Curated annotation (Swiss-Prot):
Gene Ontology molecular function terms on file: ATP binding; dTMP kinase activity
EC numbers, comma separated: 2.7.4.9
Family: Belongs to the thymidylate kinase family.
Protein name per Swiss-Prot or TrEMBL: Thymidylate kinase
PANTHER family documented for this protein: THYMIDYLATE KINASE, UMP-CMP KINASE 2, MITOCHONDRIAL
Swiss-Prot/TrEMBL catalytic activity: dTMP + ATP = dTDP + ADP
Membrane-spanning residues: none
Any single biological process term in GO: dTTP biosynthetic process
């Protein structure tokens, strides 16, 4: 790779993004691809501290705009401190959530102004967008059932939200898919993990121009 390649993983709660990424890493390493994996919110010390504030289950009174601005602040710090240097070094950067999460969660989910969110994303990222976004789609009820069945997963504030919010979030992602289908690829996350990994691998390799 002569320059970096930015991939974002998106999807509703319980879509299994993390499991897919864990399965993909050894495959990419075998190909000799230098990979940086990271997440939002978080990824760097300041971002992880912001993550704690956002996801703390006791912070039930958090205002929607406060929530959005915290995500944006984490995004900026994460980008400057970790993501941009890796891209400049020619690495493949895979981010667990990025700009589309703000549109889906705070825009469609919380009902905040989409244009304002787009402006804040533009401001925080200086216009950077992923080269490829993998959207892992799953019915809301199935995703939440997966979370409930996973005893190892720590419950966060978003897990405590009602079904209505999560349905709006999924609708937001589907709207983004319609709008930016050249960048966003939908992957059926309800299938067995092995199939999801194979599909994801094929889409990623194709996007990066790697031999399968």
């Amino acid at each position: 790779m002569s320059k970096g390649f930015l991939v974002s993983l998106e999807g509703p709660e319980g879509a299994g993004k993390t499991s897919v990424l864990e399965a993909l890493l050894p495959i990419l390493e075998e190909k000799g691809v230098e990979v940086l994996t990271t997440r939002e919110p978080g990824g760097v010390l300041i971002g992880e501290k912001i993550r704690e504030v956002i996801l703390d289950p006791s912070h039930t009174q958090m205002d929607a705009k406060t929530e959005l601005l915290l995500y944006i602040a984490s995004r900026r710090q994460h980008l400057v401190e970790k993501v941009l240097p890796a891209l400049e070094a020619g690495k493949l950067v895979i981010m667990d959530r990025f700009i589309d999460s703000s549109v889906a969660y705070q825009g469609f989910g919380r009902g905040l102004d989409i244009e304002a969110i787009d402006w804040l994303n533009q401001f925080a990222t200086d216009g950077l967008k992923p080269d490829l976004t993998l959207y892992f789609d799953i019915e809301v009820e199935e995703g939440l059932a997966r979370i409930a069945a996973n005893s190892d997963r720590e419950v966060n504030r978003l897990d405590l939200e009602g079904l209505d919010l999560h349905k709006k979030v999924r609708q937001g992602y589907l709207s983004l898919l319609d709008k930016e289908g050249n960048r966003i690829v939908k992957i059926d996350a309800s299938l067995p993990l092995e199939q999801v990994v194979e599909t994801t691998k094929a889409v990623l390799f194709d996007g990066m121009g790697l031999a399968k």
